[in-house]
Amino acid sequence: MSVFKGEVTALPPDKSISHRAALIGALSDGTTEIVNFSGGFDNQSTLAVLQASGIALIQEECAGSYGRRIRRVVIESRGLWSFLAPQAPLMCNNSGSTMRMFAGILAAQPFESVLEGDSSLMKRPMNRVADPLRQMGAQVELSFSGTAPIRIQGTKDLHSLEYRLPVSSAQVKSLVAFAALHADGQTRIIEPIRSRDHTELMLGLETIDQPNGERVIIVPGRKRIESKPFYIPADPSAACFIVALALLAKGSDIIIRDLCLNPTRTGYLAILAGAGAGISVENSRVIGGEAIGDVLVHSEGELNSLVISDPHEVANVIDEIPMLAVLSAFSSGRFELHHAAELRTKESDRIDALVVNLERLGFQCEQYPDGFKVNGRIAMPKGVVSIESFDDHRIAMSFAIAGKATGVDLAISDIGVVGVSFPNFFEIIESLEV
């Protein structure tokens, strides 16, 4: 089996922060410079819908740290109502973040627009998008099954509200916040279970933590947003795959540079450290309100099996669960997950996708509506094992890491889907292999 050593300086820029930086730049008054913008398919979809809606922007390469070439995006805008009616439906491709968050902005624009996506995105539920926007005064139409296309008749007369999030969703929280920026008063968003907080940090919104554990986000309406520069750190959700590679391949040592260490994004590091993983952080600092640092990962032996059952914990590792599940199964033979029904409405039904593929690899699994359990390995299949990616980048990468680290020969369908979030995935892995 292979061993992996070295430092990673070219992880994809954070996907979540890149989306928000572009959208906030389009809402700002002036020139917004975004340094180290993500080149992933999803983030490029956000830039494309902005341009199709009349926002002027340029994207170019420039010199970055560690001798890298990085992307720089410059957005010119005139504030909250700078958008123009698109001439055709806005294509979000596979990006649920683009579709959901941009819907909040379009709800406040005085024209009709339509948001569409690829075949996968058009199957994902969008009632959670439509409901708060309708309450604020926008007209929103979905398909009969509650999915895209999303047809929005926006209005400049949105009104503020107090909105309690029905599920833990940073995307829904953000779309309500973006709409509320245009509303006629102060909006209060109540978050029972805390999700990633990039939108609040980047907009400088007031937050109030309640004694019962809830968080209230205060969004002032019709306030000018001054343009400011953004720097995008490395994506912790992408880093999860490199961390797993180091932990599965015995004798490996990897350093990941300039990683976003926002506490709402690094729950998986705490979970793995608690299971016996050799993980440490150095060179910590804060840039633009976000914690950043270098993460050192050392393979120190077998990990304890992972049990993820606390709703707050699930919310903070929702994107990393596929890799955590595969890592735990291959390391200890066991894994258990509860309170994660949200996974069934991602790019694929990730619970089912994980179970199907783990069973092909000889693991005994049991799934239920909000999670699943791995109960050990019955037998190791011989020869090449076919893995179904379900056209889901995180499923594809999770099993690719397992195959590379353990030497199991896997044939993964539609492997090019990794480009959605991690275009240089295989290039980085190959650079680390000793």
From Swiss-Prot:
A Pfam family it matches: EPSP_synthase
Residues annotated to bind 3-phosphoshikimate: 15-16, 20, 169, 171, 195, 319, 346
Family: Belongs to the EPSP synthase family.
Transferase as UniProt keyword: yes
Positions annotated to bind phosphoenolpyruvate: 15, 96, 124, 171, 350, 394
Enzyme Commission numbers on file: 2.5.1.19
Listed GO CC annotations: cytoplasm
Name of this chain's protein: 3-phosphoshikimate 1-carboxyvinyltransferase
Function: Catalyzes the transfer of the enolpyruvyl moiety of phosphoenolpyruvate (PEP) to the 5-hydroxyl of shikimate-3-phosphate (S3P) to produce enolpyruvyl shikimate-3-phosphate and inorganic phosphate.
Residues at the catalytic site: 319
Subunit field text: Monomer.
Pathway, per record: Metabolic intermediate biosynthesis; chorismate biosynthesis; chorismate from D-erythrose 4-phosphate and phosphoenolpyruvate: step 6/7
The keyword Transferase is assigned to this record: yes
Biological processes per GO annotation: amino acid biosynthetic process; aromatic amino acid family biosynthetic process; chorismate biosynthetic process
Main location group: cytoplasm
PANTHER family to which the protein is assigned, alphabetical: AROM/DEHYDROQUINATE SYNTHASE, PENTAFUNCTIONAL AROM POLYPEPTIDE
Gene encoding the protein: aroA
EC category name: transferase
A molecular-function term among this protein's GO annotations: 3-phosphoshikimate 1-carboxyvinyltransferase activity
